[in-house]
Amino acid sequence: MTAIARNIGAGLAGLLLVGAADAQTATEVWRTTGFSSPESVEWDAAAGLFYVSNMGADPMAKDGDGYIATMGADGAIRTDKWVTGLDAPKGMAIQGGKLFTADIDQLVEIDIASGQISNQYPAAGSVLLNDVIAAPDGRVFVSDTFGNSVWVLEAGVMAIFAQDPMLMGANGLSLAGNSLIVANLGDASQGFDKIKPGYVVALDLTSRAITAYGSADPSGVLDGVEPDGVGGVLITDNMGGRLLQQAPGGAAVEVGKLEPGAADLEFVADQGLIVVPLTPSNTVVGLSWGR
């Protein structure tokens, strides 16, 4: 999920991506506007399209103006408001013909075939549900950014899976083997103007032990995290407007300049395409990830 858009400020005017000489670099190939605080993108390989969550006017308000759009791999919007009636949907994941999205204090299940909401799973006591990832065993994990925790949907019930200071500002989620990779926003308890940047951790799904994924030095106000296709991860630094890459055990390296408000990215490896919502400018960009 994005670091709350209203606390980030205006986006930069352009997008310039420059990587280190020995690193892969990303190049913008398309840019699509017309969204309403887009927060996350999810690729549906079977349908050949992206789902784009739109938070609407207020990312914390239960105001019913949130929705999900669909978009092609070329950046063209297919359906502006495919699913409506949401509040402020953020991260998404697909499992068993359903699209799951985090919507403030509940996980919403959408039937992909019909485009209708098919279930809602409240997370009583959660503060701000954020990103979502579906595990092969059927469990669905959800980060709670301001609750410093990860929740799990299992047997139709939401419960806290892990809560720990090492999950400070738990945001983006990804899977690597038996570990949940968590990109931490950082400590925003004193307000966003005094935020202490976070770093990436690994949460063992069996023991629930939490360790640093690589360097524990602050990497940024982290948002989305995705496998990079070469054994590491790609990360967005929301406030810094940066695209980062990190290998297990290593430090996060800047591989591209984005805009402040860069949110929950998606990487489609077989297309070499990174897609990033730029929340404040109501824009989604597609980037070619050179190999």
Model feature map: region roles:
Residues 26-32, 76-83, 116-122, 157-163, ...:
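A short beta-strand motif characteristic of beta-propeller blades
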Residues 1-10:
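Bacterial N-terminal signal peptides that target proteins for export
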Residues 71-75, 111-116, 153-157, 204-208, ...:
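Short loop/turn segments that connect beta-strands within beta-propeller blades
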Residues 195-254:
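Glycine/small-residue-rich hydrophobic helix-like segments
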Residues 35-47, 58, 64-65, 83-100, ...:
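Beta-rich, blade/repeat-based domains predominating
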